[in-house]
Amino acid sequence: MQPSYNVERFKETFESEYTYLNGFMRNVFRRGNEPALICPLTNRTWTYRTLNEEANRLASSLMARGVTSDDVVMHALLNSAEFVFTYIATHKIGCVNAPLNYRLSGGEIALLIDQSKPKALIYDAEFEKIISEALRSVHHRPEIIIMADLNNEMDAPEGVVTYRDFVKDGSPENPVRKDKPSIYDETTRFFTSGTTNLPKAVPVNDINEVLSAHDVIMHFPLSPKDVTMNLTPWFHRGGLHSGGPCPTLYIGGTMVILRDFTPRLALQYVSLYHITFLIGAPTVIDMLCRIQETNPRDISSLHGIVLMGSPLDKEPCKRYMKVLTPNIFNGYGTTETFWNVFLRPYDLPDKAGYAGGACTDDDVRVVRVDTTKHVSPDELVPMDKETVGEVVIFAPNKSTFAYYDNPKTTEEKFHNGWLYTGDLATWDEHAYITIIGRKDDMIVSAGENIYPVQVESILNEHPKVAESLVFGIPDPKRGSVIAALIRPSDPSLTEKEMKQFCMNHPMLAPYKRPRIFRFVKELPHNATGKLLHKLPPDFKF
């Protein structure tokens, strides 16, 4: 059919104007005097107008030093005002915002610097030692190195400029970008959590950021009246895009900065700033719940708590609904595709333990596992909540289907727009998915496949268990025996109790029962709160 309008004119306008920055600037115009960002530690509030001016100062200062749309600005920043200034400033320049996981080693950071070759590097003073270590071993040294500190009082080391000095002559006026913006411009480069090897660089373009913001706005839902606080580091996608700077500043809401998480401080901020949405991993929300049970505060402003990073079990879910808010959400996704599966308050607590159902614009399926090739997305496993398959995701609105500078892994993980996640799952007749584990976490014992997450969810049902970690130990007879690390919520818990519990549980087959238990104070998690199924090399059973 012949279009009745000028398609080329529509494309040209849409592709250059439907950008994240234009969304933010609409709020500067409409809500200029409304609060955009609050930093409790410095007792400062930025309105949309003053936040825009601060971002302009950084953008114009970077441009004066030669940063263009061809460049990368990398940063190792805590949740902070400078993080937000950098995020907006890079959109204004048209360059790539590349937030680093500041918990990596100096050697790992050096490799990521050499891969992305940033023109500028911004870091918090807390990371001076690790950044200095990284810079000593890089082949590519950024031309501009900036150190931020919370109170703008510290002096920078040689070869580094303080943030306050770098931006002091920057113009508060909106800078003029030298080239035409496009929704296809890479705007942010995330790095995967690196649970299997060195983090992979994931490019996200402008339209991905806009539609990721829309996804959050639609699913929470989020409005300009909301006040959000993301309890996780903003350097990962769930931090930046789930109730973090990306959607909150796009819709015109207010963000409260939590620089370093403590449960008491988080609850204090909820009460003081009338926060409506919290975002965090189940382990973090569990800490909030325990404090609120013993020392309750007024947290009646909460409209919802969004969990991500690991499965949400039924008993904890019921506690959170009773103690914190009845509106609990749980999201599952990847760095590559943002979140793609969601549990909403009307699903809970009945469907706790599930990852959820697919998000509105996404297609998520469980397909036959084949280690030799990509199976067709149509080769589905039965929807019987028993047959295990691999989760595949089609989310063209939130993905570029690629890794930066890594064609081999791109070919391995993406096929015809589908991401092959490596996550194993079952699903039911309503297409609700339950994550069982990862392909590379699967334990084979006496010829049987055992999925750690499945066993952990059962162990976590014990009233004295706060959290568990299940893995295999090499065994000459069985290949592997099942072992469990337990973080108890009650110090009186014994190995005998756990073995009896496993023996009596109707959903734990004998071959899946842990043979060895050890009790620990902490379990290993990555920066996003996800449980790591890799023990330290010096750990002995």
What does each model-found stretch correspond to?
Residues 33, 146, 161, 168-191, ...:
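Conserved pre-ATP/AMP-binding loop-to-beta segment of ANL
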Residues 33-80, 84-88, 105-110, 164-165:
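Conserved AMP-binding/adenylate-forming core of the ANL superfamily
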Residues 45-49, 187-211:
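Conserved AMP-binding A3 loop
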Residues 64-65, 92-168, 488-491:
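Structural core segment of the AMP-binding/adenylate-forming
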Residues 104, 111, 121-123, 278, ...:
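AMP-binding/adenylate-forming catalytic core of the ANL superfamily
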Residues 164, 275-280, 289-352, 359, ...:
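Gly/Ser/Thr-rich phosphate-binding loop
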Residues 210-227, 235-277, 290-292:
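Conserved AMP-binding/adenylation subdomain of ANL enzymes
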Residues 372-412, 450:
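Conserved ATP/PPi-binding loop(s) of AMP-dependent carboxylate-activating enzymes
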